[in-house]
Amino acid sequence: HWRCHAQSTSENPESKLYAFENGCKAVKAHYDRIGIPAEVEQGPFYGMYRTHYLWKEQPLVSILIPNKDHAADLKKCMDSIEEKSTYRNFEFIIVENNSTEEETFAYYKEIEKRDNVRVLYYKEDFNYSRINNFGAKEANGEYVLLLNNDTEMIEPDSIKEMLDVCMRPDVGIV
C-alpha cells in the first residue's frame, strides 16, 4: 500500500523538486568518489539524470563496416557520419567481402584517397564475426565501432555518447 497526497512526490513530482536536485548531487558525488570526471543534470523525466563526461582524451575510434557491393548504401553510411558526427577522431575500415559490381570498386578507389579510410579485402565466405575480427586486427583505434553498411547516423553525438560510456574503467563494451 502506498499513500499519496498532494505534497507527496508520488502524487506530484513537482511538490518536492529539491529531491531531484539532490538526486543530481548524489550522482555527481558518486562520480567524484570513483574518480570519473562528469557533470550531471536533470534528464527528460523527474528521477532521471543525464551524465556529461568530461574526458580530456579524444581517442581514435575505428569504424568497421563490412561491405559486399551496395556502394550506394556504404556511401550514405559514411557520408552521414562525416557530415553529422560531432566526434571527429575516427577512421573508417571497410572490409570488402567478395563484391562483383564495378561501381563498388570505383567507390573504393574514391574513398581510399582519404586519410581516414582503408579498404581491406576479406576473400573468404561471408561470416560476420570473422569479417569484423579481420578488420579489428588492422584497426589503429583504441576503440572499435561495428556498423552495417546500411546504417545512417541520426544523432550527431552518438559516437561521443557511446565512447563516453565505454571510456569508463568499469565498462568493457557498449
Residue ranges and their predicted role:
Residues 65-76, 87, 98-99:
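Active-site beta-to-alpha loop of glycosyltransferases that engages the nucleotide-sugar donor
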Residues 122-139:
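Glycine-rich, basic loop-to-helix element that forms the pyrophosphate-binding segment
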Residues 59-64, 91:
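Cell-envelope/extracellular polymer assembly enzymes that use nucleotide-activated donors
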